[in-house]
């Protein structure tokens, strides 16, 4: 979100929230500004995130230094298995750097996935979103298989996962918030939601 200041320049003043439906599931996208002063906002949003789409401004290498500071701060808060996909944005502009140049100049690992994108034209945005959702699905696929077996036996699930009552409550509540399962608290059962599969 940007606002025009008295000096006629536009400045970032807030965050964006988007919801996209994929395979019947709502994917919540929280867009935080790429400015250092929004650290507190990023720290709050990163808690509980399932994946990160990190955008580099491919047309303005002078913004990379702040970008790397932000990326490193975010990485420290993430669980190790949390996937990150990178975007080399503004490919619609003349002189925009190729994704491999962005990778090299920012010391991203060789296996990091980086898409050439343009938020203005929509280039590769769907592909990047599908990629990160697939990575998230792969992270959850093993637990979803186990959950399907124990839908009417929470105690059996707790035993299988070696979790106590509080840990089970937290796990199931978290999965319900993320809309992977629906909990029936009266019957003390849950149901894994249909539709979870890899996106092509």
Give the predicted meaning of each segment.
Residues 2-37:
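Switch I (G2) and immediately adjacent beta-strands of P-loop GTPase domains
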Residues 92-142:
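Canonical P-loop GTPase G-domain recognition
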Residues 179:
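Glycine-centered, phosphate/nucleic-acid-interacting loop/turn motifs that mediate DNA/RNA or nucleotide
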Residues 50-55, 77-92, 108-117:
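Conserved beta-strand/loop subsegment of P-loop NTPase cores
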Residues 136-161, 169-170:
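Short amphipathic alpha-helical interface segments
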Residues 35, 48-69, 78, 91-96:
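Conserved Switch II/interswitch segment of TRAFAC-class P-loop GTPases
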Residues 166:
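Key DNA-contact positions within bacterial/archaeal DNA-binding proteins
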Residues 139, 151-153, 183-200:
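Short, cationic-aromatic polyanion-contact patches
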């Amino acid at each position: 979100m940007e606002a025009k200041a008295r000096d006629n320049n536009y400045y970032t003043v807030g965050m964006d929230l988007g919801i996209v439906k994929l395979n019947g599931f709502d994917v919540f996208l929280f867009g935080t500004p790429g400015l250092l002063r929004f650290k507190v906002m990023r720290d709050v949003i990163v808690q509980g995130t399932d994946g990160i789409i990190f955008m580099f401004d491919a047309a303005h290498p002078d913004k990379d230094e702040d970008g790397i500071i932000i990326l490193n701060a975010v990485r420290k808060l993430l669980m190790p298995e949390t996937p990150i996909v990178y975007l080399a944005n503004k490919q619609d502009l003349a002189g925009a750097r190729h994704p491999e140049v962005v990778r090299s100049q920012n010391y991203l690992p060789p296996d990091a996935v980086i898409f050439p994108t343009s938020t203005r034209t929509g280039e590769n945005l769907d592909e990047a979103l599908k990629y990160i959702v697939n990575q998230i699905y792969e992270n959850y696929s093993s637990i979803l298989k186990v959950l399907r077996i124990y839908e009417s036996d929470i105690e059996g699930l707790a035993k299988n996962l070696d979790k106590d009552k509080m840990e089970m409550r937290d796990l199931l509540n978290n999965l319900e918030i993320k809309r992977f399962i629906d909990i029936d608290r009266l019957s003390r059962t849950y149901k894994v939601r249909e539709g979870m599969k890899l996106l092509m």
